[in-house]
């Protein structure tokens, strides 16, 4: 295979992040300097983000049999890079109070971002598996980064063991699919899986095992049990990455698989996915009702959000609007989650033991940090899907595609789930405006809005509001990503 200059340009984000990994690794070996390594990481991620413009000039192409670079890949690469940038930005002040090695944090985030970019470009079950492992392995270390806390170490061990088990299910499922179809390429699967072949027991078993593995990575019921514990035990900046980059890009590659391979044509698979979506929406919202820890609450909330997205995935065969719905919803989910976890990160920085993740820590926040409380309120309203926020646009799209595909009971679940979600999101928002306790707990620095993390949080809030009122620019970007697939 000949590598042309066009191929290299198409792979620029992957190459730049890979080069940044090597540079940061050498920098750590040469001299430990927290500011230097954080700066190198942020510069590398920004350069990769800018390089997407050059990738767009090249056009869609299959760079290798394992990777396809097109508008769809660029959209999800951009979302992963934004989430990685935000994670590094939130981590810097948190690590300032951390007494152990700080620099490896950025190295692990960069490697996870590399896995995310590979997943966004995946066009083959082999690259899908490699990407998932490359994004998962660094997270084992990141989740347990505050290893002197029992909660963080426990979360890391739990996530590592369960993730390894899920990966084995995924790999075994791929082996069964290969045994029946004779190919692992998404396009070849679409050609080889002809009429009636999807009802073959071996193929159904293979896709069933893959659903188990991918369901774990996406925190779908009943593979969700790790989610609240890991979100609570992981440092706040790591929870940011877990909630955004890893979920978004894995869902994106599943969308590509469903688009090329006629997996959704199987009635059995559609029914299983519909049951999982229904259970995720209802269970995720019901479990979030009783939470007093904001990271656990957001963990259960993420289960329900992935359930909403599954509705659009099931409706994929009925029209292109499903692709648009997923893109808009994921963008709204990204900015809302970055803002919410960003506030938790600011409240928890610098590192002083456990994060400020108790709901009690946010009681009366408005009276001494009014702008921060307003940002958190906007994020809660967006996650709840209230009009005038980007979250509402995404949820409206999901309901529209559900109605278009006649998935009435799933549309009902989305409506009921949203109503339940409204209660616990408003409970968080209302607590921000109650009287502050006599003995306040953790607090964000007085100049938080001038820090890099504060700026990211404010920009996220601004985007959620502006795109909630005028979503056309985002919709145009998402539509541009579709014809190139």
From Swiss-Prot:
EC number, as in UniProt: 7.1.1.-
A biological process term (GO) from this entry: ATP synthesis coupled electron transport
Segments passing through the bilayer: 8-28, 35-55, 71-91, 105-125, 127-147, 159-179, 203-223, 235-255, 271-291, 297-317, 326-346, 373-393, 408-430, 455-475
Membrane topology designation: Multi-pass membrane protein
Main enzyme class: translocase
Catalysed conversion reaction: a quinone + NADH + 5 H(+)(in) = a quinol + NAD(+) + 4 H(+)(out)
InterPro entries xref list: NADH-Q_OxRdtase_suN/2 (IPR010096), ND/Mrp_TM (IPR001750)
Compartment annotation: Cell inner membrane
Gene Ontology cellular component annotations, sorted alphabetically: plasma membrane
Keyword Ribonucleoprotein among record annotations: no
Similarity comment: family membership: Belongs to the complex I subunit 2 family.
Subunit composition and interactions: NDH-1 is composed of 13 different subunits. Subunits NuoA, H, J, K, L, M, N constitute the membrane sector of the complex.
NCBIfam families listed in its UniProt record: NDH_I_N (TIGR01770), PRK05777.1-1 (NF004439)
HAMAP family: NDH1_NuoN_1
Name recorded for this polypeptide: NADH-quinone oxidoreductase subunit N
Protein's organism: Shigella dysenteriae serotype 1 (strain Sd197)
